């Protein structure tokens, strides 16, 4: 029987094998494949209307500033590259770079990579993340933001904090409601990581957060109600209440109360997207129906992972920071995702990457705990690693 040195055994179990890591090249390859699929396959069955309008300058100068910016970027790329698919690839590579940066900062490895891969391989995310449009720009900014926040938790550094703020500004500019939810997460995560230690349990802090949130809603309710009923809901109806195989003419949400009281069924409907009946009427939606189911169960699994994170700061960041931001994101998405399944898929692609943040944070924790002691910051990462292994 051959003796195996204990040091070799320890080294083998300390660092994950290279084949178990998610490489940045794989991320870029996935986005390139989605771009080619969207341009040469998907566009034959469903229009890439917004992407074509951006590249052709279809939106006039009277459009919003963010639409004008995307139009200028797209038309400039078309003028330089002369080929539509190359312009799509340019937007796709920006989104891929953001995701690759997040993967690098989180040191994604082992079982932590599977939820991210499941998301990257779903059509509801991949198609719109890989073509010209606001979605690919937002996803790139979100990837940079998530990577900077994970990196700041792992190694601190003012440059990461500033980078996160720049990416956050980009998200607020491109998609204000979703960007506002990310701003909430940024503030909560920063307070938990850098603020004073209050010595309260997670349950007590959750109750305090709920009380403060309820108080803020009560104080701001008149303005919030006017904004939702006077701007958000009419805009959503005007966007999508046109005849289409994927337009739900039977839905009509007119007041803030109707929006919040119907969340028990409108939220799952908006997240999943096409229903079986809509898929039967329009078979091209079948891959997106499957993707919607994957996203829905991934959301439930992510919530479970947040509460199962190692005790202390990691769990507080996820429960007190990520979970409220995710809730605000989903509620703000419902008016734009429930009326039209096809358009809702495009809107949802912006924030789907945020679903995998619990695994990114836990992957960074596990990878940091496995580093040699001389390379680690003086924090009790071994305690977190033991919690991950339980």
Each model region followed by its residue ranges:
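Alpha-helical transmembrane segments and terminal signal-anchor/GPI-anchor hydrophobic tails
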Residues: 44-45, 49, 55, 175-310
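Short hydrophobic/aromatic helix or loop-helix immediately within or flanking a transmembrane segment
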Residues: 52-84, 266-270
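Loop-to-helix entry region of an early transmembrane alpha helix in multi-pass inner-membrane enzymes
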Residues: 68, 80-97, 288-293
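Transmembrane-helix motifs of polytopic, lipid-linked glycan transferases
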Residues: 89-109, 297-301
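Transmembrane-helix signature of polytopic, membrane-embedded enzymes
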Residues: 102-123
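Membrane-interface transmembrane helices that cradle and orient dolichyl/undecaprenyl
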Residues: 106-110, 145-160
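Membrane-interface alpha helices of multi-pass inner-membrane proteins
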Residues: 126-128, 160-183, 187
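Short acidic/glycine- and proline-prone juxtamembrane loop motifs at membrane-interface regions
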Residues: 130-138
């Amino acid at each position: 029987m051959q003796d195996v040195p204990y040091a070799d055994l320890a080294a083998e179990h300390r660092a994950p094998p290279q084949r178990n890591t998610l490489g940045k090249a794989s991320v870029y390859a996935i986005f390139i494949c989605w771009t080619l699929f969207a341009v040469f396959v998907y566009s034959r069955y469903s229009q890439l209307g917004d992407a074509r309008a951006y590249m052709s300058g279809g939106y006039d100068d009277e459009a919003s500033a963010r639409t004008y910016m995307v139009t200028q970027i797209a038309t400039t790329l078309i003028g330089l590259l002369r080929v539509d698919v190359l312009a799509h690839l340019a937007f796709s590579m920006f989104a891929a770079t953001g995701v690759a940066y997040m993967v690098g900062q989180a040191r994604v490895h082992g079982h932590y990579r599977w939820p991210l891969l499941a998301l990257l391989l779903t059509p509801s995310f991949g198609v719109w993340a890989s073509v010209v449009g606001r979605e690919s720009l937002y996803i790139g900014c979100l990837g940079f933001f998530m990577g900077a926040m994970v990196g700041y938790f792992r190694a601190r550094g003012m440059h990461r904090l500033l980078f996160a703020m720049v990416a956050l500004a980009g998200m607020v500019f491109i998609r204000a409601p979703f960007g506002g939810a990310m701003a909430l997460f940024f503030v909560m995560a920063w307070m938990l990581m850098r603020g004073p230690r209050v010595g309260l349990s997670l349950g007590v802090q959750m109750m305090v957060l709920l009380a403060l949130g309820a108080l803020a809603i009560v104080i701001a309710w008149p303005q919030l109600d006017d904004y939702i009923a006077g701007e958000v809901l009419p805009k959503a109806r005007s966007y999508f209440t046109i005849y289409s195989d994927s337009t739900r003419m039977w839905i009509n949400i007119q007041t803030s109360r109707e929006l919040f009281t119907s969340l028990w069924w409108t939220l799952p409907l908006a997240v999943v997207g096409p229903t079986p009946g809509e898929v039967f009427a329009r078979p091209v939606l079948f891959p997106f129906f499957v993707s919607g189911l994957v996203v829905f169960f991934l959301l439930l699994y992510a919530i479970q992972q947040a509460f199962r994170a190692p005790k202390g700061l990691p769990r507080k960041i996820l429960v007190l920071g990520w979970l409220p931001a995710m809730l605000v994101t989903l509620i703000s998405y419902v008016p734009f995702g429930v009326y039209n399944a096809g358009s809702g898929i495009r809107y949802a692609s912006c924030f789907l990457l945020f679903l995998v943040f619990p695994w990114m944070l836990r992957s960074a924790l596990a990878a940091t705990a496995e580093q040699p002691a001389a390379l680690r910051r003086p924090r009790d990462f071994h305690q977190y690693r033991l919690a991950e292994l339980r």
